Amino acid sequence: MKVELDSFSGTKIYPGRGTLFVRGDSKIFRFQSSKSASLFHQRKNPRRISWTVLYRRQHKKGISEESAKRRTRKTVKNQRAIVGASLELIKERRSQKPSDRKAARDVKLAKDKEAKKADKAARKAEKAKSAAAGAQSKVSKQQSKGAFQKVHATSR
């Protein structure tokens, strides 16, 4: 036994009951009663008519005893070690007081600044050394013999 559904109200239509309405675009609508057919032709919205299945579904009627509320699982935060930091190290850093952390940061920054300064001074000394050596070695054989030096144009 094939049971159809009313296109408007959503109620069951048993064999031998109801009517068919075929629209101009060949879409078929089945109605259980002339009441639902009439409301369909008046272009009424079944969600706003209280006795239809769509209305009852939208307003959660008659299903409260059927399905209990679904429980959602609570997320639990878990501490894990990451690359370059063990779990103990992370816990130790977390337990540090902000003032201690700030002091450690300042010490590290000062140390880095000193290292950068020393590196810069070393590079400057190296550059000066190479410049002094370079000035002597840049003279070619021709120039050392007293050959004519080309004068570069200073104006355009």
Swiss-Prot record:
Classification via PROSITE patterns: RIBOSOMAL_L24E (PS01073)
Stretches for region Disordered: 87-156
Annotated InterPro entries: L24e/L24_sf (IPR038630), Ribosomal_eL24 (IPR056366), Ribosomal_eL24-rel_N (IPR000988), Ribosomal_eL24_CS (IPR023442)
Keyword Glycoprotein recorded: no
GO cellular component annotations of the record: cytosolic large ribosomal subunit
Amino acid composition bias (Basic and acidic residues), ranges on this chain: 89-129
Keywords, comma-separated and alphabetical: Ribonucleoprotein, Ribosomal protein
An example Gene Ontology molecular-function term: structural constituent of ribosome
Biological-process GO terms, alphabetical: cytoplasmic translation
UniProt biased composition (Low complexity): 130-147
Similarity field: Belongs to the eukaryotic ribosomal protein eL24 family.
Protein name: Large ribosomal subunit protein eL24
Native source organism of the sequence: Debaryomyces hansenii (strain ATCC 36239 / CBS 767 / BCRC 21394 / JCM 1990 / NBRC 0083 / IGC 2968)
